Amino acid sequence: MTNIHNAQTTNTPNGSSPLGGTRGGLKVGILGAAGYTGGELIRLLLNHPEVEIVFANSESNAGNLFSDVHEGLLGETEQCFTAEMPFDKVDVVFFCFGHGKSEAFLKEHSIPANVKIIDLAQDFRIKGNHDYVYGLPEIHREEIAKCQHLANPGCFATCIQLGLLPLAQAGLLTKDIAVNAITGSTGAGQKPGATTHFSWRNNNLSVYKLFTHQHLHEICQTLNELKPATAPHVVDTLDEGFEAEGITVDFIPYRGDFARGIFCTEVVTLEKQTLIAPSDSPKGEGDRPDGNTSPLGEDGKGLEGLDIVALYKTFY
């Protein structure tokens, strides 16, 4: 959600919004608004002074208050979900569908060409036969402000990339990268499953999608986009028939016994004794100047940001 929020609040000339509306008048529609992603998006937009939610679509909850589904919104608004999708009345529409459903929706429905689309699923994150901009503001801020179609990055992908991008940009990623990351249960979506029940998740930790998580595609894509031509290629091991020459991101995701947030550890080997100062990194969201050696998982819950801490060990 950081990426959406940052894109909307970027200053632009003549009092206009980077998404195409005017200050105090950006009209927004939301599809798939009853899920966890839709609920968090509604919370952010309700508190945004430049946004009006024109409709939030959910056929199964049409007529129900937002707070009937997203209880944390009780008292914040009296708006209801709708079955209608009046695209001609909005400047931008958010897709909060499950993965794979955005592309299918666009094949079956017509959205006016002047309406901007922000897709929160993974359908358009990988470059291909489309014009969607990958919505990581630390590297694509100007493109985001100008684009018509935006693909919001994945949760793991955002966390992992922001730690690695300064090193990639400096050409320092020359060895395989080890990543371990723990995610909360809401990352699995609202629909209950065997691995999301409290009785299974509480006081438990488990590995899933070992070295095969789908976010590897977008991580490798961005690292290769930023690295100098002389730096090793980052191999996307999920691609069929990939060539092994280059370096890999060895990513092990874990299910944690908490609801929200991601805690990530990235281990890289640097051939040069070089440290990247926060000011040298892509336009990011700061460092941790208080001297703490580790961020806390609870620190970032409900916030549009993250902590990055760099620890290093010198081998002689």
What residues fall within each predicted segment?
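Charged docking surfaces used in two-component/phosphorelay signaling
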Residues: 187-234, 239-273, 303-316
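Intrinsic-disorder-associated, low-complexity terminal segments enriched in Asp/Asn/His/Tyr and depleted
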Residues: 11, 236, 280, 287-292, ...
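Glycine-biased, low-complexity coil/linker segments
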Residues: 20-24, 240-241, 284-286, 297-301
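Serine residues within intrinsically disordered or low-complexity segments
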Residues: 16-17, 279-281, 294
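Low-complexity intrinsically disordered segments
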Residues: 6-9, 19, 227, 234, ...
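N-terminal Rossmann-like NAD(P) cofactor-binding subdomain of oxidoreductases
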Residues: 2-11, 25-210, 229-231, 242-244
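Residue-level hotspots at or immediately adjacent to binding/recognition sites across diverse folds
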Residues: 14, 118, 290
